[in-house]
Every structure is written in C-alpha cells, then in structure tokens.
Amino acid sequence: MNIFNPNHDRKAIVIFSGGQDSTTCLFQAIAEYGKENIEAITFQYGQRHAIELEKARAIVQDLGIKQTLIDTSVMKAITHNALMDEQAHIEQKENELPNTFVDGRNALFLLYAAIYAKGQGIQDIITGVCETDFSGYPDCRDVFIKSMNVTLNLAMDYQFNIKTPLMYLTKAQTWQLADELGVLDYVQKHTHTCYEGIEGGCGKCPSCILRNKGLKKYLTQKGRKNV
C-alpha cells in the first residue's frame, strides 16, 4: 500500500470528524503534504454522537493542526434520521437505506469545505468516504464524489481535487493503513466511531461492529504473517 507520496508544495484540507476513517486520512495527509500544509474542517450538524466533536478537537490540538468548525445544525429542521435523533432506534430494514443516513450530508460537507478551501487557496480536499465496507450510503460512492468534484469545479470556476484515499479499502485495510503510518494504537485509543455516542463504543451499533470486525480481521492477518 503506497502511503507516502511527498506533495509538500501543495496544501490540503481534510474533512475531519474525529472518527477512525477521517483520522487515518489526517495522518496520511500529514505524511504526504507536511503538517504545516494541512487544515481540518469539522461539521456540527446535530449528530447524536457529539462526543466525536470533542475527539476531533482533542486530536487536532494534539497534532497541532488548524481546525475550522462549521455549524450546519440547520439540517435538523429539514430532515429526520436516527443519527440526529437521540430517541430513534438505529435500524436498517431490508431493501432500504439505514435510518442513520443523513440526506445531503456529504454533499453539504464537500460544498462548505470547497467554499472554505477556495478562500484559502487550497485545491485538494480529502474525505474518508468508502464504498467497500460502507453502510449503503449513496453519498459514499465514488460515482457521487466524482460528480461532486465536477459540480464544484463548475460552480466556483476553480480546480478542486477531491481525494478519497479509503474509497476501495475494507475496514481491515484501513486499520492496516493506520498501522503502516505508525498510528494504529493512536487511532484505536483516540478516535470515536459509535453512533450511540458511548465512550469506547457500544459494540452493538453498525459502526462499532464494522470497526471492531475490521480491527480483529487485520490483527489476525498480521499475526499470521508474523508467524
């Protein structure tokens, strides 16, 4: 897995939630661009797992990365889903999107990130979306990202480059990437993934299950290679 591609003459902004995927992307971006060329942008959209905002703030402070926090909580007034309703039971019915899907979330994140990036003279936008081990969210697909990239370029007459380093990685491979970057323990200890907002994870929600299953698979594979 090629993780180092020195690109220190450019700047990049990472859409950063404080979760496993975006934190792994942040570390990879630091390796590729240099810490001084990286910024993080985080969104407060009324998520029930607001603890991730605390994790995000702690991580960027620890790493010395500039963070911009954008309030998009107006979304709660126009859409309903289990990720923004603490009383809703998280579930996925057959042949339907999970009720944790937030309509328009990634489109909005990319739009605001692009507006900010252009103002800072930044072209590269990094997001940790993935369509290999994902929950069926349509806005995590590569076809959407490519479409959004074209739309933003046309909308602002600016050459954005949306990068998705995790797009075709399984969750186990994302853990592998963190390990290759030398930050597996850091990601495991300091990031938050749980939809329920429970410190350390509930172990039962789809996000926790995917995270834990991926870690177990990677560590098992790593153990076999070291035998």
Swiss-Prot record:
Q: Which GO terms describe its molecular function?
A: ATP binding; ligase activity, forming carbon-nitrogen bonds; zinc ion binding
Q: Which InterPro entries match?
A: QueC, Rossmann-like_a/b/a_fold
Cofactor stoichiometry and binding remark:
Binds 1 zinc ion per subunit.
Q: What class of enzyme is it?
A: ligase
Q: Name one Pfam family in it.
A: QueC
The record lists ATP as bound by 16-26
Q: In which pathway does it act?
A: Purine metabolism; 7-cyano-7-deazaguanine biosynthesis
Q: Does the keyword Metal-binding apply?
A: yes
**Residues passing through the membrane, by range:** none
What are the EC numbers? 6.3.4.20
Q: Where does Zn(2+) bind?
A: 194, 202, 205, 208
- Which keywords annotate this record? ATP-binding, Ligase, Metal-binding, Nucleotide-binding, Queuosine biosynthesis, Zinc
Name the coenzymes or cofactors required: Zn(2+)
Q: Which GO terms describe its biological process?
A: queuosine biosynthetic process
Q: Which reaction is the catalytic activity of this chain?
A: 7-carboxy-7-deazaguanine + NH4(+) + ATP = 7-cyano-7-deazaguanine + ADP + phosphate + H2O + H(+)
Q: Which residues form a coiled coil?
A: none
Q: What does this protein do?
A: Catalyzes the ATP-dependent conversion of 7-carboxy-7-deazaguanine (CDG) to 7-cyano-7-deazaguanine (preQ(0)).
Q: Which NCBIfam families match?
A: 7-cyano-7-deazaguanine synthase QueC (TIGR00364)
Family, as annotated: Belongs to the QueC family.
> Under which name does UniProt file this protein?
7-cyano-7-deazaguanine synthase
> Which organism is the protein's source?
Haemophilus influenzae (strain 86-028NP)
Q: What is the lineage of its organism?
A: Bacteria, Pseudomonadati, Pseudomonadota, Gammaproteobacteria, Pasteurellales
Question: Quick one: which gene encodes this?
Answer: queC
